[in-house]
């Protein structure tokens, strides 16, 4: 997840011709620690930043408060739902579109009709549940006999829990492994077991060339470029952003050569 946002910032920087000195990064800021979040944002402001992107859900409330305190600075929060229509907006994407397509791929390549899904959060998180629903709908459109089995880690980044969840799903007979979590363990575990995987966030063929049927991917540079450009040229309108495949924000990778005949 963080890696794809970093690629997005790099893409924006290249597209707009910005120098390295114009980009300030604050990494590993605990989104459950409001003081740490506030400190990181304040440091950005003190270093002269006038556009601040926060990529984690937990930054939302602090960004909302600081947007009120600094009305001349643009605050853009990823994955959240709060905004003020002025200098505080939220952004995300129609990832369900790509999830649906990846479900079609999974449904056409399972032999056991059992498909595993390692999820970072439970049903209280609409981002995760919406992705599962879209994935399941894609599966059902081509293989109504297949079922999706979900294991929850209760953390966006929990390597050991993700590995354990993957092994549990394999023990249940799942032969395609999808995920909404931050490590490649569901994919590497699938490859080690000789079954297929559906990657997420970035192209996971790099880690699992023998298992990855396709990956659901983000191209965050599509958003970062358009948002920063709008501020530069004066067309910024304070609206929230919710792009999809049409905007080039979400997609799936090319299909693996070993996908079942007819997968398209």
For the regions a protein language model found, what residue spans apply to each?
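A residue-level marker of the well-folded mature domains of exported/periplasmic proteins
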Residues: 1-264
